[in-house]
Each structure stands twice: as C-alpha cells, then as structure tokens.
C-alpha cells in the first residue's frame, strides 16, 4: 500500500460541527446550542417546542 496521510484535525469551520442525532457534518444548526442538521431539526422541531408561524 502507498503512503497515506490522514486528513488534518479541524479546530474550526464547517467540518467540525456534527449533528447530535445522525452524525452528519453538513448544514448543522448551532443556534441555541441545538447542533442538529437541518433534516433532523425538521423532524424533531415541534417536539422541542418550535412552531411554524406561516
């Protein structure tokens, strides 16, 4: 096997935040300390007390 360099450990940026529910790294909502991706947020938002106004 050839040389392999593991990816650098990130300290900040989009790849650091992880969804608490599914582990996804893209489109994570950090506001209010949620740390949920937008798909998981849509599934559990009503149970958490968020309500649609429109």
From Swiss-Prot:
Family annotation (InterPro entries): Ribosomal_uS14 (IPR001209), Ribosomal_uS14_arc (IPR023676), Ribosomal_uS14_CS (IPR018271), RIbosomal_uS14_euk_arc (IPR039744), Ribosomal_uS14_sf (IPR043140)
Database matches in PROSITE patterns: RIBOSOMAL_S14 (PS00527)
Superkingdom classification of source: Archaea
Cofactor needs: Zn(2+)
Any GO BP annotation: cytoplasmic translation
GO CC aspect terms: cytosolic small ribosomal subunit
Coiled-coil annotated residue ranges, if any: none
Pfam families per record: Ribosomal_S14 (PF00253)
Known partners and oligomeric status: Part of the 30S ribosomal subunit.
Role summary: Binds 16S rRNA, required for the assembly of 30S particles.
Similarity comment text for this entry: Belongs to the universal ribosomal protein uS14 family. Zinc-binding uS14 subfamily.
Designated name of the protein: Small ribosomal subunit protein uS14
Species annotation: Sulfurisphaera tokodaii (strain DSM 16993 / JCM 10545 / NBRC 100140 / 7) (Sulfolobus tokodaii)
């Amino acid at each position: 096997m050839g040389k392999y360099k593991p990816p650098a450990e990130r300290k900040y940026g989009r790849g650091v935040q992880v969804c608490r529910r599914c582990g996804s790294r893209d489109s994570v909502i950090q506001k209010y300390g949620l740390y949920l991706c937008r798909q998981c947020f849509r599934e559990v938002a009503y149970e958490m007390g968020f309500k649609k106004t429109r």
